Amino acid sequence: YACLCSSHNRITFHAMNTIVNRSDGKVDLHGLVQAISQSSAEDSLNNLLSAEQWDLLSSYLLPVALPAGQVLFAQGTTDRTLYLLESGSLSVHFEDEKQRLRLAIVGPGSVVGEGAFFSHLPRSATVQAGSPCKLWSLPAMRFTELSNRQPAVAVHLVMAVGAVLAKRLGSRKRRVAST
């Protein structure tokens, strides 16, 4: 997990060899925005936010560095955090008493955690880093703050994530891969 260090009203984020240092508490999302705009995956996020909206959203997102092989979240857990993937790849798999079934590989410019984020239900799958990953997390409580303070940004984000969920549910092989 990324380190959050604070001193003299300056917040420094350390994530995968990158240090973002801004006195306003916002983080630099250039890499994420670029990953979204360059992604050709069917289930990638659409870049529905303006530069100003990305800047407003940046103060609500938390950086996460995930080494290869580490689990981001496990099937059955009740956390509702939404994750936006800037770099790396994530493996989504479902386990029961008989088998472990890989459902999808998610690449940069996409999102995971959308199922629990919207449904308030436990996670339907486990998500694990297939390679070192840089992600941005939006915990449910921070999304509530975003909704109250920047409703237009929250609506645009929900529409983009909802579109990803709809695409995944519309795709036979990814139908069970909404996490």
Functional labels for PLM-detected ranges:
Residues 5-179:
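Cytosolic regulatory regions built on CNB/CRP/Popeye-like sensor folds
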